[in-house]
A protein has these predicted regions:
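C-terminal alpha-helix plus adjacent terminal tail
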Residues: 1-13, 44, 54-56, 156, ...
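Crotonase-fold acyl-CoA enzyme core
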Residues: 2-7, 85-193
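A structural preference for short, pocket-lining loop segments at secondary-structure junctions
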Residues: 11-21, 32-70, 85-96, 114, ...
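Hydrophobic alpha-helical membrane-association signature
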Residues: 33-36, 78, 215
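Hydrophobic alpha-helical segments typical of transmembrane helices
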Residues: 78-82, 136-139, 148, 195-198, ...
Length: 235
């Protein structure tokens, strides 16, 4: 039986743990990961989720760059559906980030309601070379403000854990982020099931979903175009 690249198992305080587990590809997102990931978030939408990686050295390297253009477009479309489910589901989502989170991986972390990071966490909001893609422009203004959001998406520069905490990209940085997330999960559970859903409904208002859908449509159109010649040579 093939090893599952997304594992769903019981987590702390009644949470369901959704664990990325494709260490040979640094949790790069192919259809074999994105389909069960979407299913895990869509199932039992009132159940809270803890999202983490089985490999503490890497959260997610983004979309798998070795797949075909057609599969890449399908992965992108499913990922944006996944982000929308994460935002609109009633149960809260806590992301535990250790190591790098790049492109679609950075968006997975950002789409969580709460983000707990280790000191080795880092983020980069960039897409595959040769593609005019917006990566996280729908989300980052709500987290760090418009000006910094545009800087991060336009330059694709790295953000380390200390800066991520300072600018509001993560809630907190802890030496043991998994343990801290378990404490946070208990705190949320103590508030009862309705409080988180009520807060999420209000936080998703005001254009967030409109921006998500606009970015998804723009990126689907861009992925339908041939890659730039240099990017084709680099593949």
């Amino acid at each position: 039986m093939p090893h599952p690249s997304v594992r769903v198992e019981p987590g702390p305080a009644g949470f369901r743990r959704v664990r990325l587990d494709r260490p040979d590809r640094r949790n790069a997102l192919d259809l074999g990961m994105v389909r069960p990931l979407h299913a895990a978030f869509a199932a039992e939408p009132a159940t809270p989720i803890l999202l983490d990686s089985a490999d503490p050295g890497v959260f997610c390297a983004g979309a798998d760059l070795t797949v075909s253009d057609a599969e890449r477009a399908e992965i992108s479309g499913l990922l944006y559906q996944c982000y929308e489910v994460m935002i609109t589901r009633l149960g809260p989502v806590i992301a535990v980030i250790s190591g790098p989170a790049v492109g679609g991986g950075a968006q997975l972390a950002g789409a969580a309601d709460l983000r707990v990071a280790g000191p080795d966490a880092s983020f980069r909001w960039t897409g595959p070379p040769g593609r005019a893609l917006a990566v996280g422009a729908w989300l980052l203004p709500s987290l760090v403000g418009r000006g910094l959001a545009l800087e991060l998406t336009m330059t694709g520069r790295w953000v380390d854990a200390a800066e991520a905490e300072r600018i509001g990209l993560v809630n907190r940085v802890y030496t043991e982020p998994g343990q801290a997330a378990a404490v946070l999960a208990k705190q949320l559970a103590d508030q009862g099931p309705g409080a988180a859903g009520a807060a999420k409904r209000v936080a998703a208002a005001g254009g967030l979903l409109d921006r998500l859908r606009a970015e998804r449509a723009a990126n689907q159109a861009a992925l339908a175009e041939p890659a730039a010649p240099q990017a084709q040579r680099d593949r």
